[in-house]
Amino acid sequence: IFGIGGHPGFNLPVNENISKQDYYFTTQPSEARVKIPLTDSFLDWENRSLASTDSLIGISDELFKNDALIYQLRGHDNKISLRTEKNKFHINVWTRNAPFVGIWSQYPKTANYVCIEPWWGIADRNDTSGKLEEKYGMNHLAKGKSFDAGFSITFHGKD
């Protein structure tokens, strides 16, 4: 039984002509995804919802006031992009076989970075038993079997 995840964080180039609020996320494939809110650091399972990720998700400090945005990816290959219209800077995070992604930035203190975190495991649900073998989102690997997953990141300059 195991869970694993990445924690890549990205500094947002900001200056007098561009602010954190000029950036946005896009996802591919464009489809509705289950969004799982957090309450007191636990997955608020009863309040999960179907969220549209087929349009731009604008970045603001307030976007993260309730902690990370967590989406179920259903293990498909996905691309989460961080970009702006103010220059050609963008980052693509490609996930392979990840069931979840967390998108996060510091709050209430603010910073000019965001994290795009592919996860093969997840925080406890608010109805957790506390037993690892019953934990939601864990990976179970039979003897002699293998687990294959990954993510990659591509960076594109602002010029």
Model-derived segments and their meaning:
Residues 7, 116, 144:
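A residue-level signal for conserved active-site and pocket-lining positions in enzyme catalytic cores
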Residues 24, 79-81, 115, 148-152:
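Beta-strand secondary-structure signal
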Residues 9-96:
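Active-site/ligand-binding surface loops and adjacent short beta/alpha elements
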Residues 1-5:
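Short, hydrophobic/aromatic beta-strand segments
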Residues 131-138:
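Short alpha-helix capping/helix-loop boundary micro-motifs
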